[in-house]
Protein backbone atom coordinates (compact mmCIF):
# COMPACT_ATOMS: atom_id res chain seq x y z
CA UNK A 1 0.00 0.00 0.00
CA UNK A 2 1.85 3.06 -1.20
CA UNK A 3 -0.41 5.32 0.87
CA UNK A 4 0.67 3.63 4.10
CA UNK A 5 4.33 3.91 3.09
CA UNK A 6 3.91 7.61 2.40
CA UNK A 7 2.22 8.15 5.76
CA UNK A 8 5.00 6.25 7.54
CA UNK A 9 7.71 8.27 5.83
CA UNK A 10 5.85 11.50 6.49
CA UNK A 11 5.47 10.67 10.17
CA UNK A 12 9.16 9.86 10.41
CA UNK A 13 10.04 13.12 8.67
CA UNK A 14 7.81 15.08 11.04
CA UNK A 15 9.51 13.44 14.02
CA UNK A 16 12.95 14.32 12.67
CA UNK A 17 11.89 17.93 12.14
CA UNK A 18 10.46 18.07 15.64
CA UNK A 19 13.70 16.73 17.11
CA UNK A 20 15.77 19.26 15.17
CA UNK A 21 13.56 22.11 16.36
CA UNK A 22 13.82 20.79 19.91
CA UNK A 23 17.61 20.61 19.74
CA UNK A 24 17.83 24.07 18.19
CA UNK A 25 15.69 25.54 20.95
CA UNK A 26 17.98 23.99 23.56
CA UNK A 27 21.26 24.98 21.90
CA UNK A 28 20.18 28.54 21.14
Curated annotation (Swiss-Prot):
Which compartment or compartments is the protein found in?
Secreted
Repressor keyword on record: no
Q: Which GO terms describe its biological process?
A: adenylate cyclase-activating G protein-coupled receptor signaling pathway; epinephrine secretion; mRNA stabilization; positive regulation of protein catabolic process; prolactin secretion; regulation of protein localization
Which keywords describe this protein according to UniProt? Amidation, Hormone, Secreted
- What's the superkingdom here? Eukaryota
Classify the main location: secreted
The modified positions for Asparagine amide read 28
List the InterPro entries.
Answer: Glucagon_GIP_secretin_VIP (IPR000532), VIP/GHRH-like (IPR046963)
GO cellular component terms, alphabetically, are: extracellular region; neuron projection
Q: Which Gene3D superfamilies match?
A: 6.10.250.590
GO MF annotation terms: neuropeptide hormone activity; peptide hormone receptor binding; type 1 vasoactive intestinal polypeptide receptor binding
Among the Pfam families in the record, one is: Hormone_2
**Similarity comment text for this entry:** Belongs to the glucagon family.
In Swiss-Prot or TrEMBL terms, this protein is called: Vasoactive intestinal peptide
Q: Which organism is it from?
A: Capra hircus
The top of its lineage is: Eukaryota, Metazoa, Chordata, Craniata, Vertebrata
